[in-house]
Amino acid sequence: MFDVTANGASIPALGFGTFRIPGPDVLRIVPHALKAGFRHIDTAQIYGNEAEVGEAIAASGIARGDIFLTTKVWVENYKHDAFLASVDESLKKLKTDYVDLLLLHWPNEAVSLAEQIGALNAVKEAGKVRHIGVSNFNTALMAEAVKLSKAPIVTNQIEYHPYIDQDVVM
């Protein structure tokens, strides 16, 4: 498998997503994904399986530095203090002291984008994440996020397939 590079991040092009995979199934399936050669594992706070993802990675025998781990902060945690606490909780569940990529899961107008991006930058500066990004942002929000961020926004993770044309965002 090959990597793509974006703003200093080298990201495995093909990742194994854990959306809608219950915890017990994660414990069974993620080891097979790792054995098959996947080195990018994607999870999120809202998926409810971060602990099992962390357990599967820890038990894999693969060095943590050889796995690219992505998680996402859920919208209810976007206020600065809640954001910081939720990242610490995610790291504990994932059994690691950093994630390779941390994303804002969805846009949330209830919290200013400046506060959201500020929190992303704070956890990056603290060494808890290597790279930051967003998910499901439209082009205007993405442009604003880039302007607000001290650190590079390395990705806007979106759903893209023949039934969802997102060429405008791409």
Language-model segment annotations:
Residues 16, 33, 41, 53, ...:
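Conserved, mostly hydrophobic/aromatic
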Residues 83-103, 122-126, 147-148:
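CE4/NodB-like, metal-dependent polysaccharide N-deacetylase domain
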Residues 64-77, 98-107, 136, 159-160:
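A short, structured active-site edge motif that brings together acidic residues
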Residues 1-67:
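N-terminal binding-site loop/beta-alpha segment at the start of enzyme catalytic domains
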Residues 107-170:
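Beta/alpha (TIM)-barrel catalytic core signal, keyed to glycine-rich beta->alpha loops juxtaposed to Asp/Glu
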Residues 21-34, 79-95, 113-115, 140-144, ...:
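Short, acidic/polar
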Residues 12-24, 71-81, 110:
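Active-site mouth loops of central-metabolism enzymes
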